[in-house]
Regions:
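Active-site metal-binding loops of divalent metal-dependent hydrolases
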Residues: 8-10, 38-41, 59, 80, ...
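Conserved beta-strand hairpin/beta-sheet module of binuclear metal-dependent hydrolase folds
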Residues: 1-47, 121-139, 155
């Protein structure tokens, strides 16, 4: 399995050479390419990426609105994400039911509801290929059922919006919304024994740190919260095999 990152920043003004594109990455296996999210400023790249299928975690612009240009590629998303994006010219929509596993190419994909936004709910993807299990969180405050989503996973692609300063707040309804910290996510990985993590979707603070400082900070947090977990920062253009040690 190979991962390629085409965009690694969130919906923030800050950008750098390493992080200028909104969220988009592919999972490639057995000649099949699954595109996970496709943010607004990635428009025009579909012809270059040439995915066989697309997964959308939720309908916020920095995750889904690269599809404003339209596509005939199958787009897998929750019912609410399809409803919110109904005006986008997506011609082949596949609805993901919570915790119901479906085949997408050679992979088995299960959508797990997460907490992120009241009007734009998010689902994480648990993707299985043989013995390898990858979990992509999308934007997240928490999983509704963390053990079901994370137990047995070997690789986690997580929300890098903030390292230690919480961006979680309460909606008028009392529901939590926003982004949890990398530190908190590493705590989950330590609890469930996930061996490797790659963070993407970086916010203002992580982008402004620069890559050497960001790498050091991630490693320090992993040592604290998930000893033995190998952690890395994604960057635009990064390509790596899941077997890579970097």
């Amino acid at each position: 399995m190979r991962l390629r990152f085409y965009g690694t920043k969130g919906f923030v003004e800050e950008r750098s050479r390493a992080h200028s594109g909104h969220s988009a990455f592919t999972i490639e296996a057995e000649g099949f390419r699954l595109l996970c999210d496709f943010g607004q400023n990635r428009k025009g790249l579909l012809a270059k990426i040439r995915p066989d299928a697309i997964f959308l975690s939720h309908a916020h612009p920095d995750h889904a609105w690269g599809l404003e240009e339209g596509t005939e590629i199958p787009v897998h998303a929750s019912a609410i994400t399809h409803e919110i994006t109904k005006d986008l010219p997506i011609r082949n929509r596949v609805t993901l039911e919570p915790e119901r596993t479906v085949s997408v190419g050679p992979c088995r994909l299960t959508a797990f509801p997460g907490i992120h936004a009241v009007r734009c709910p998010c689902v994480a993807a648990r993707i299985e290929l043989g013995d390898l299990v990858l979990v992509y969180s999308g934007d997240i405050v928490a999983f509704e059922r963390p053990e079901a989503a994370l137990a047995g996973a070997g690789l986690y692609v997580g929300d890098g919006s903030t390292l230690k300063g919480s961006l979680v707040r309460r909606h008028a309804t009392g529901a939590l919304m926003g982004h949890t910290t990398v530190r908190a996510q590493l705590g989950w990985l330590g609890k469930y024994g996930v061996a490797r993590a790659i963070f993407s979707h970086f916010g203002k603070g992580p982008i402004e740190m620069g890559e050497p400082a960001l790498k050091e900070a991630l490693e320090e947090l992993a040592t604290e919260k998930a000893p033995g977990c190998r952690v890395a920062a994604a960057r635009d253009g990064l390509s790596l095999a899941t077997e890579d040690s970097s």
